[in-house]
Amino acid sequence: MRKAFYTWLMAQRNSTSNKPAALLADLVFEDTTFPKHTDDFETISRYLEEEASFSFNLGQFDQIWEDYLSH
């Protein structure tokens, strides 16, 4: 079983980086309602589109998701 997206994303945190994964990781870290225990694309994508307390380029999210799947 693949580790949760949140767990993988937290390993990408880097406050000095401008990489999209690092930026998203910092935003998600501050969001207490982010779905932390799932590896389901639809659940996370829907959350980012409809419920997140921040905005993020979903085109960049798609690339981050591909990186997640390749690890």
From Swiss-Prot:
A Pfam family matched in the record: YozE_SAM_like
Stretch forming the signal peptide: none
SUPFAM superfamilies given in the database record: YozE-like
InterPro entries associated with the record: UPF0346, YozE_SAM-like, YozE_SAM-like_sf
Record family assignment: Belongs to the UPF0346 family.
NCBIfam families found in the cross-reference section: PRK13672.1
Name of protein: UPF0346 protein SZO_05010
Species of origin: Streptococcus equi subsp. zooepidemicus (strain H70)
